[in-house]
Amino acid sequence: MTRLSFGRKFFLTFDYILLSILAFLCLLPLVNVLAISFSSSTAATANIVKFWPVDFNLKSYTYALSKPEFSDAYWVTIKRVLIGTPINVILTMLVAYPLSKDDRLFRWRKYYSWVFIFTMLFNGGLIPWYMTIKTLGLIDTFWALVLPGAVPVFSVILLLNFFRGIPKEIEEAALIDGCTHWRILWRIFLPLSAPAIATITLFALVGHWNSWFDGLILMNKTEHYPLQSYLQTLVISFDLKIMNVKEAELLSQINNRTLKASQIFLAALPIMLTYPFLQKYFMKGIVMGSVKG
């Protein structure tokens, strides 16, 4: 067993301490939001809630889950993730596979690669983007949230580099055995690229779940808003229509701050539950997809 030098031990100790401090600082806002969401309106208004609930209650969550606007926005986002993520992953694979081939198999590979890279570095601006979507008749439709970003270029580059790292001898042996490129992609490349596939899947999932700007721009009706667009309007709005609630007990335990905190935490919860299971694939896919080529 190799013994670590003093300098190496010092570096690792400093590294762990620094990362622990940064992780703690990142958790503080989330813990504060969670504590506020479980606190009474009186405690939240008095600004005495720090990192532990004061006068614990679940009224904010009960009211948040009963609001049709919140439920509709949640459903739109779930549908967007379930439909948009597979579309992103499938199209990314179909684009990355031919671009990973040699020039003798795909003559215009470098040209198309630069076209994709150019679109990642430069864009036509907000107004041309909006006019294009409007011309396609997608304004105020669900597909406006999915199709404009159906082929994420960064994911294409990541998967492209991963595909190039697969030994060519495997593909050549499969071609000799009579496999088509479709079969090579689905039976050989995809199983070997599981970490990269998991990485781009996580990118797509988080991107769809956290996207808010396109919903505000492309949706005319609030009932078509995805969750993050709804929360964005909620954060800047001071009128949450709480006065529609008749029960005096509920009114005494809910205010704007506790309701916002509960809805923000409910919006972040699915990602927090999903990420730990994909983290190992995420790190491996990022490292291998960035160094191979």
Where are these regions (language model features)?
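A hydrophobic, multi-pass inner-membrane permease signature
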Residues: 1-293
